[in-house]
Amino acid sequence: MSARPRPPAGRHPRALRSLATVPGGRRGKWLVLAAWLLIVMALGPLAGKLGEVEDSSANAFLPGKAESAQVNTELEKFRGQDEIIPAVAVYSRDDARTTRADAAKAGADRTALASLVPEGQKIAGPLPSDDGKALMLVVPLTTGSDDFTADLEKVRDVAAADAPSGLDVAVGGPAGSLIDSIEVFGDLDTTLMLATGAVVTVLLLITYRSPVLWLFPALSVGFAAVLTQVVTYLLAKYASLPVDPQSAGILMVLVFGVGTDYALLLIARYREELHRHEDRHEAMRLALRRSGPAVIASAGTIAIGLACLALADINSSRSLGLVGAVGVVCALLAMITVLPALLAVTGRWVFWPFVPRYGTEPRAARTVWARIGGLLQRRPRWSWLMTVGVTAVLALSATGLTMGLTNEEMYQDKPESVVAQEKLSAHYPSGSSDPATVVVRTAARDEVRQAASAVDGVESVRPEDRTADGRLTTLSVVLDDAPDSEAAKKAVDRLRDAVHQVEDADALVGGTTAELLDTRRAAQSDLRTVIPVVLAVVLLVLIALLRSLVAPLLLLATVVLSFFGALGASHLIFTQLLDFPAMDNSLPLMGFVFLVALGIDYNIFLMTRVREEAALHGHTKGVLSGLASTGGVITSAGIVLAATFAVIATMPLVSMAQLGVLVGIGVLLDTFVVRTVLVPSLALDVGARVWWPSRLG
């Protein structure tokens, strides 16, 4: 028997009513748990194989149709799947010319490293710099070697050993950059999963203040993580789902974050129903029916929003969007099946020491959220105008964004390859360590070489290699400027224009500079393509869920405003606190998709409850009751989600750290400003017209 009337069961979709009876049913709960145990036992070992299908090649992070990506594909023809990548050892003195002992050291290193060089290749150097303060060895290595990483480490060990006093030695070049990147990504997904799991556990303990209850959402999220890894592995292996190490790492954070959010919301509603129903199975059945539509709509919005990234040109964006959508769906399945089953098996005692007693009222009406609602009711228009003004001021900071990280700026701590690049830039033509690559028909090689040599910004051009059939040749083009500089990117544009004009050459220009240029342009294009689609999808979901046109438009406007506020606040943190010189090119798009999808998440939870309460008590009381009822749980969910993304901010890659900071700030802004003040005050000011054209009831 209920303490107050609730909407009849018939208001909920029949499929949802049927689903709700299974996980919380007297028999169904055992079937659900048995099914999950079988799935985990049978497929669990596949979760550990996800790393086997991750693609860490350069093309995994490039626009799929970019010219630089085509060059990387063409280069595979030169030695099968093997690629010659040079390691560059730099021996330098800051305030003096190199000595004979320094030259002898570099010469001895050349001899010691000769055994690492693949057949047909040779070590170049020691090459002195024009200022006489540095020497350089270029050691070609092959990615086809089983010991590629060990070979690079040997180069570093040999170069660093027995160096004369005052001689600085660093090994970088493309091989050094590749290995440093691999080391960063090596255990990224495992590290993120363990760190996120620890954060979620601590926050659940604080939220529930129970020695037992936290175990059930944590265990359910663990099931979701295993299922996510298994499904992602199978889709990658058999359906060509693109997965890179970065997306695999963020995937675990997303699953833990949204999975815990859904657990918090379901448990909060279950606790309410336990106050009204003596039978825990009936309480769970009703909790699923009444919270299910919001949770499913939320997960659907996030999953579809992330899936919109499949329209992006940049492969890493497509990867994160698609695997993220898989993770959200798996998290949803776990939270609406295994979690209710676990809670239905155990009963009320898991809430100890705060056990919900049958026949008593929940404390929502006496919480701080009820008092906040009362304050908003007095001056709703002033409240939302003030909130919009403050958020808009934050957003103004986003107008000063500097986009595009250089190679040296990609890491929070400088790896050796970055140090080597800095030394090279100080003493040699800046592009010498990482030249552009031109793939051309051999018959047109000389014409292309002549055209490339005449380009402003090109230091030198020399033939490098040809395919076994002799049809294709590569040219190494050293630029005047550092590979990641704006001047080098402009030179690549001029180089492309020049070589493309050579008839029947089919010339393609790639290399690091070309990759950076192509990625930046694709990121700008992706913004124009993906953002309108995401907004349209989210709007349609809100219209279907709330059966209104006004409310969805208002809610969408609030999350867009929140995104720009978060972007501005993040820019201040990046420049004033963290000393990041620029934002990663992909950050605006990734941040927008995550924050719009996750931000609308909390609006869905709030407004579905407001509509439910408004149908019973009228619009104004419904808004206040909805805020009071959901305030605590949505705040907890927001803190959990922000904390999980904060874990990403501790990663060594600046691009990931920036994503973690932006999403974390955005979620907190949505939680404490948009959902707490802006949306309720707008709903109170607009009144029942917010539900137009539908009627409550």
Regions found by a protein language model. Name each.
Residues 1-54, 119, 143-403, 513-697:
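Membrane-embedded transmembrane helical bundles of large multi-pass transporters/channels
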Residues 51-55, 86-93:
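Short, conserved active-site loops that position catalytic residues or coordinate cofactors/metal ions
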Residues 56-58, 406-407:
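Short hinge/gating elements
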Residues 64-86, 93-178, 402-582, 604:
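Structured non-transmembrane domains adjacent to transmembrane bundles in polytopic membrane proteins
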